[in-house]
Structure formats: structure tokens, C-alpha cells
Amino acid sequence: MAATATMATSGSARKRLLKEEDMTKVEFETSEEVDVTPTFDTMGLREDLLRGIYAYGFEKPSAIQQRAIKQIIKGRDVIAQSQSGTGKTATFSISVLQCLDIQVRETQALILAPTRELAVQIQKGLLALGDYMNVQCHACIGGTNVGEDIRKLDYGQHVVAGTPGRVFDMIRRRSLRTRAIKMLVLDEADEMLNKGFKEQIYDVYRYLPPATQVVLISATLPHEILEMTNKFMTDPIRILVKRDELTLEGIKQFFVAVEREEWKFDTLCDLYDTLTITQAVIFCNTKRKVDWLTEKMREANFTVSSMHGDMPQKERESIMKEFRSGASRVLISTDVWARGLDVPQVSLIINYDLPNNRELYIHRIGRSGRYGRKGVAINFVKNDDIRILRDIEQYYSTQIDEMPMNVADLI
């Protein structure tokens, strides 16, 4: 892409041009010593990596890449905050690939992600960018065969991307050897360091060599996370976007007032034709609700697919494959989908339930406007949700209007 290099999956999306001025509006609250490197050619990257970057379809680094890649390559600990769809994944992937010694068939970089799908996507992106480097990269995730993990790790992997539980398990079994690890990347750190993953990350961290470089990347960095970074980062460089900038421009946000829960379903059915203009994701807060809504939609003869964390890994993979290819157009999901999964053609998000915490809101709707294309987010709001909606508006300094009749024209 000309203005932003974002880890996309379809060729056309990669080539999509963003206007130059779109990037200049992004304000960074950044450590003073961070300079801007405007092209990939001037970053001092190895030749075979540059080939991979251009072959992937990237042309010009995005704002976060212009600032972060050079610092990571220098060996600095980095806290990078950037909006969804601005190329965060490519930022650390390019940096990791640059720092590898390909002759040494040992794990030199470890990337932790909160979901299996995100870990697999990171692995695929690394293999694509490192296509000319002969890089070995394995996704170490729960729900897959442990024996296969052990076999792959014994063969030797330069980079391991994975979920904290399985990665720690592999370290404990001594299948994943940590002695050569130079860099730890925490992707979607706000989610990772939330209660569920905090302990596991510390467990993994204790096994790493003392001089390991730490890179932490996320869309939102609440205060308590910045406090935690003090524990395992040394004099980190900060590359931060002002929070006001965090709701993506180009995403129109609306609400539909529904007096009670039962009315949400009728509203969704009325909107179905609008949903299928491109592709849509519908978010519910619980797995049970996802299953219930999927069944109810199918009973009413609407075609939908669904995904949540309790489904077997294989099933989730095939659902994602269908959705990416466009074979399925409407996906009902829990927040497992909200983090970092690129499907360029999604331009409509529906919050059937408002998210349980306001941090999640940006992860959900930050999907629909990726690559600078316009997107629409529609929030179903019961009477007792009005307070939550106002809180979200205030938190992100944004405005959420009542949905107009002609919403289909906006997609």
C-alpha cells in the first residue's frame, strides 16, 4: 500500500492507496528521540527482507512503521500504540525478521497473542514477508496436537508465535528452548495483560534470557498496563497515539434504540439485506448468545455463520476461511474475533450487545474501517444501555447518532 503497509490477506486490499493526508492527521505522543523514516529503503533492512516486503504489496511504511521499526531494530524496548488497521502486525514482523540470524536454527523471537486466530495470522504474515529468507516460523496454539508442536520445535524454528498457555507448556516441556531468544513481542497487550493472561505472560517471561528485548503493541493502553510495563521493560521508547484519535476516522457510528432485548432480533432481521451488501460481523457478549442468535437466524431462513472460543480449532479455522473468501457474508461472534483479524471487505459491524467494557469497543469497530475504507458500526441499545453508550462516546470523544433510514447507502 502506498500510505500504509497493513497485514492484509487479499492482493487488492494490499494495493489499496490511502491518501497521503490521511496519515498526517494521526498525532503521535512519542518519545523525543524517535525520528521518522519515510521509506522501507532507508530503514537499513536486509535485501531479502525488502524483497519480501515489496512482493507482499507494501510500498510505503505507515505512520507507526516509520517510527517504530528503526527503534526495534536498534534493540530498544518499545511500547507502540497504534490504531487498528495501521500496520501494527507488520511493524513487529519486519523488525523480528531483520533481527534474525537465519544460520542459527533456534528460536530467536517469541510473539505472544491473545487468540489462536491472531497467532496463526501473525505466523502467516511472517512467512509471507520472510519468503526470500528461508525463515522457519511456527504457531504454538492451544487446541492443536501437542506432538506436532514438539516435532516442529525439535526441527528448529526461528520465530514462535503463540498463545501464552501453550507457549509456556512447550517451554516447561523443554521443547521450546529459550536460550537464544532475543526478543519478546506482546501483541494486543491490553487484552494479553488483562487478568486472564497476566500470570501466563509472567511465567513465560521468567524463562527468557535476562537481556531479552521487549516490544509491546496494542490499540489501547490503559494506565494499569503502562504501570505493568515497568516490571519488564528497560527505558522503553514510547510511540503513542493520542486517545482522541483512537476511534477510526471514516467509521460512521450509529445506535438503534430497542426497548427490550426481544426486539433486537426483529431489528437484526430488518437489517439483514443491508448486512449482505458486503460482509458484516455481529458481536454478542456470550458464547451462549452467539449460539442462540445463530440458531434463531437460521430458523428464520437467514444465512449466517458463527464463531466463539469454545468451538474446536479446526472448525474455527474453516469458518474463518469461508468468511475471508467471501463464501459466508455474515459472521456472529464473541470478542474472540475482535482482536487483530484482517478481513478487508468487512464494512459493517453490529454490536447486538454493547461490549462489557469500553476498551473492547474500539477493537470491535476498529475492524470495519481498515485500509482507509469507510465503515459503519451499528449499536443496539436498550433503555438501560444508554448510560454505557454515553460513557463510550465520552471516553473516545466521539458522537454516536441515531441510525438513519438510508443506512444502506453509507456502506
Swiss-Prot record:
<dbReference type="GO" id="GO:0000381">
    <property type="term" value="P:regulation of alternative mRNA splicing, via spliceosome"/>
</dbReference>
<keyword id="KW-0507">mRNA processing</keyword>
<dbReference type="GO" id="GO:0016607">
    <property type="term" value="C:nuclear speck"/>
</dbReference>
<dbReference type="GO" id="GO:0045944">
    <property type="term" value="P:positive regulation of transcription by RNA polymerase II"/>
</dbReference>
<keyword id="KW-0509">mRNA transport</keyword>
<feature type="cross-link" description="Glycyl lysine isopeptide (Lys-Gly) (interchain with G-Cter in SUMO2)">
    <location>
        <position position="152"/>
    </location>
</feature>
<dbReference type="GO" id="GO:0003724">
    <property type="term" value="F:RNA helicase activity"/>
</dbReference>
<feature type="modified residue" description="N-acetylalanine; in Eukaryotic initiation factor 4A-III, N-terminally processed">
    <location>
        <position position="2"/>
    </location>
</feature>
<keyword id="KW-0963">Cytoplasm</keyword>
<keyword id="KW-0694">RNA-binding</keyword>
<dbReference type="GO" id="GO:0098794">
    <property type="term" value="C:postsynapse"/>
</dbReference>
<feature type="domain" description="Helicase C-terminal">
    <location>
        <begin position="250"/>
        <end position="411"/>
    </location>
</feature>
<keyword id="KW-0508">mRNA splicing</keyword>
<feature type="modified residue" description="Phosphothreonine">
    <location>
        <position position="163"/>
    </location>
</feature>
<dbReference type="GO" id="GO:0000184">
    <property type="term" value="P:nuclear-transcribed mRNA catabolic process, nonsense-mediated decay"/>
</dbReference>
<dbReference type="InterPro" id="IPR000629">
    <property type="entry name" value="RNA-helicase_DEAD-box_CS"/>
</dbReference>
<dbReference type="GO" id="GO:1990416">
    <property type="term" value="P:cellular response to brain-derived neurotrophic factor stimulus"/>
</dbReference>
<dbReference type="GO" id="GO:0008306">
    <property type="term" value="P:associative learning"/>
</dbReference>
<dbReference type="GO" id="GO:1990904">
    <property type="term" value="C:ribonucleoprotein complex"/>
</dbReference>
<dbReference type="GO" id="GO:0003729">
    <property type="term" value="F:mRNA binding"/>
</dbReference>
<dbReference type="GO" id="GO:0071013">
    <property type="term" value="C:catalytic step 2 spliceosome"/>
</dbReference>
<feature type="modified residue" description="N6-acetyllysine">
    <location>
        <position position="124"/>
    </location>
</feature>
<dbReference type="GO" id="GO:0030425">
    <property type="term" value="C:dendrite"/>
</dbReference>
<keyword id="KW-0007">Acetylation</keyword>
<feature type="binding site">
    <location>
        <position position="342"/>
    </location>
    <ligand>
        <name>ATP</name>
    </ligand>
</feature>
<dbReference type="Pfam" id="PF00271">
    <property type="entry name" value="Helicase_C"/>
</dbReference>
<comment type="subunit">
    <text>Identified in the spliceosome C complex. Core component of the mRNA splicing-dependent exon junction complex (EJC); the core complex contains CASC3, EIF4A3, MAGOH or MAGOHB, and RBM8A.</text>
</comment>
<feature type="modified residue" description="N6-acetyllysine">
    <location>
        <position position="321"/>
    </location>
</feature>
<dbReference type="InterPro" id="IPR011545">
    <property type="entry name" value="DEAD/DEAH_box_helicase_dom"/>
</dbReference>
<protein>
    <recommendedName>
        <fullName>Eukaryotic initiation factor 4A-III</fullName>
        <ecNumber>3.6.4.13</ecNumber>
    </recommendedName>
</protein>
<dbReference type="InterPro" id="IPR001650">
    <property type="entry name" value="Helicase_C-like"/>
</dbReference>
<keyword id="KW-0597">Phosphoprotein</keyword>
<keyword id="KW-0547">Nucleotide-binding</keyword>
<keyword id="KW-0378">Hydrolase</keyword>
<feature type="cross-link" description="Glycyl lysine isopeptide (Lys-Gly) (interchain with G-Cter in SUMO2)">
    <location>
        <position position="374"/>
    </location>
</feature>
<dbReference type="GO" id="GO:0045727">
    <property type="term" value="P:positive regulation of translation"/>
</dbReference>
<comment type="function">
    <text>ATP-dependent RNA helicase. Involved in pre-mRNA splicing as component of the spliceosome. Core component of the splicing-dependent multiprotein exon junction complex (EJC) deposited at splice junctions on mRNAs. The EJC is a dynamic structure consisting of core proteins and several peripheral nuclear and cytoplasmic associated factors that join the complex only transiently either during EJC assembly or during subsequent mRNA metabolism.</text>
</comment>
<feature type="short sequence motif" description="Q motif">
    <location>
        <begin position="38"/>
        <end position="66"/>
    </location>
</feature>
<feature type="binding site">
    <location>
        <position position="65"/>
    </location>
    <ligand>
        <name>ATP</name>
    </ligand>
</feature>
<feature type="binding site">
    <location>
        <begin position="367"/>
        <end position="371"/>
    </location>
    <ligand>
        <name>ATP</name>
    </ligand>
</feature>
<dbReference type="GO" id="GO:0035368">
    <property type="term" value="F:selenocysteine insertion sequence binding"/>
</dbReference>
<dbReference type="GO" id="GO:0035613">
    <property type="term" value="F:RNA stem-loop binding"/>
</dbReference>
